[in-house]
C-alpha cells in the first residue's frame, strides 16, 4: 500500500497550555481554516469539535487528548489537543511522549502561568521542539512583550519574536512578519478568514527595524556561517532566516513566538504557516531507540521508514460506545495494516488488529494502512495497556514507556445497591486501564474500595463517567490525602527467617543496609559476593522488600524514597526457597523501617491566587493559616498574584472559602509540587487516628 503523504510532509503536534489560555479555541480555528470543520465550535457554548465527552461540553474544559487530522500547504498535520487542568496531567504526558512538536499557547494577559511551567517541563523531558502562540491579544491588559520576557525569565527559554502586533486590546487588528516585512491585517467582517497584506505601518517602522535586527542577531548566533555573513555586513535572505529558525527550533535552542486572538480569528493562518515551516517532521527528530526485551543492554534503532520492521507505542486506550476498545498508536518504524497480527513485546502475546481508524475528535475515518510517523487508532487489541510496544514477533523491541504521575488524593467508593457491586468493580477496572494515573485499591482494614487520582476534579469526572457510561450508581466518601511514609536515617538489619514444622523447613537469612533516598523512589542494590545467597533467590528478596514497603510502619501508608542494599546472608541447601527469602526480605525491611526513624510525608501543592488588591491582606492571612509558605508576589493587569506552597490537606473547600472572602472576584489554580515531612504534632494525630486510638 503506498502512502498518500510523504513522511517529511507530516507534522505530529500537540496544543498545550494552562487552563483557559485558549487551546481548544485555537484548535477549533485551525480546523476551520484547514477546511475540516465548516462551522466554528465555541467552548463556552459547549460545541467545540475537539471537546467530545459530555462532561467536557458541560464544563467547557478539555479532559482527554482528542486527536484529529488536517491539511495545510501540502502537509498533513495530526493535532492532539491536551487538557490544561493539572488533574489531567497524564493526558499531557502521554501526548508529549508521541509528538514531534508542540504549540504552547499563552494568555496575553496572564503570561506564563503555573500549569504552563509544568507542561513546559514535561515537554523538555520528552525533548519536544515548540513554537509559542500568545493568544487573547484583544483582551484588556494584553501585553505581547511582557509574555516574551516571561518565556525567557520563567521558562528559561530563548524566545524569537517573529511578529510585531498591530495594536493591542480592542485595537488589535493584525501582525507584522519580522522575516518578510509584510503586515497582515485581519478582516473582522469575514471572521478573520479574509485579510489584507500590506507594508509595515509607518507608526511601527522604528519598532519593526529594532525587532528585526534583534531577530537576525539571535538567528545568526545559532549558525556560524550566518554569523560570518552577518558580521561581514551582508544581508541575510528570507530563506536563510527561515532555515536558521527551523534548525534552532528543532535543536530546541530557541522558540519562535507568534501572537493573535483565536477567538477573534486573528493570527491563526500565520500560526499554521509556522507549524509547517518550523516544527519537525518525524524524520527531522532523533530516531527512536528501543531495547531488546530479552536483553535490555542491547539497543535497537527504529528508523522512521515504512520498510523497516514495525515498532509502535500504544499511548492511550479509550472506549467507544459503538466500536468498543480503541488503542491509540504512534508508529515509529514500519507499518500496520488492518487484519495483521502484531506482537506485544511487554506481555509476550500476539494479537490481531481488526480495524484501523484515523480520528477526527469523535468522528472516525476507516483506513486500511498506516505507516511510519503516523498516529492512528486500532480496534481489536484486547490485551494491551498504556505504554506497551507492538512490533513484529521476529524483531521484538520495547520502546521507552510513559512517566505515570503518582495520585495525590483518594476517596472511598461503594455501590449504592448490591446489584451495582459487580458492575462497579468491572467499570473501575476498565477506567483504570484507560487512565494509568487513576488507581483502584482495596483497604483490608476497613474493607472499603479506594479510588485515587490527581485531584478532586479528576475523581469527580470518574464518578460522573460511572453513571453516564456504565450506568453504575455509587456513594463517594470525603476526599482523603494520599500520605506517604519514609525513613530519616540509615540503619543495618540482620534478619534470619527459619521455620521447622516437620518435613522440609523454611530458611532465609539476609543482612540489609537501609538509607533515605530523597525524591528518587525505591532503589535495590545487590552487593552479595561469593555466592553467600544464590543469585536465583535475590529477586525474591527484592520483591519481598517492595511488597512490605506498600504498607509503612507508622500508619500503613506506602513507604517511599528508600534505598536498600543486600550486603550479606546465608542459605540452607535443603530448606531455602524463593518464598523463604521473600519473607526474610519483607521482615528485614519492616524491622529496618522501625529502627530508621520513620516519618510521615504529605503532598504540598503549588498554589497561585489572583486577587483584587483590596482583598490581598485577607487572602494572605488565610493562606498563612493554612500552613502556606509564600514563594512570590506579583501584580498582573491590576490584580495581585500570590504564588505559595500549601499542604493539600489544608486546601479542601478552599474554592468556596476564597469566593466568599473576595465576593467571587478572586480565583486560584493549584498543582502538586512535592512531598514534605508532616509537622510532628500533626503526624502524631494522623498516626493515632489511623491506628484507631
UniProtKB/Swiss-Prot annotation:
Chief place where the protein resides: cytoplasm
Q: Single Gene Ontology BP term?
A: ribosome disassembly
Q: Which CDD domains match?
A: EF-G (cd01886), EFG_III (cd16262), EFG_mtEFG1_IV (cd01434), EFG_mtEFG_C (cd03713), EFG_mtEFG_II (cd04088)
Q: Where in the cell is it found?
A: Cytoplasm
The protein's matches in SMART domains, at most eight in alphabetical order, are given as: EFG_C, EFG_IV
Name the family the entry cites. Answer: Belongs to the TRAFAC class translation factor GTPase superfamily. Classic translation factor GTPase family. EF-G/EF-2 subfamily.
- List the protein's name: Elongation factor G
Protein's organism: Oleidesulfovibrio alaskensis (strain ATCC BAA-1058 / DSM 17464 / G20)
Q: What gene is this protein a product of?
A: fusA
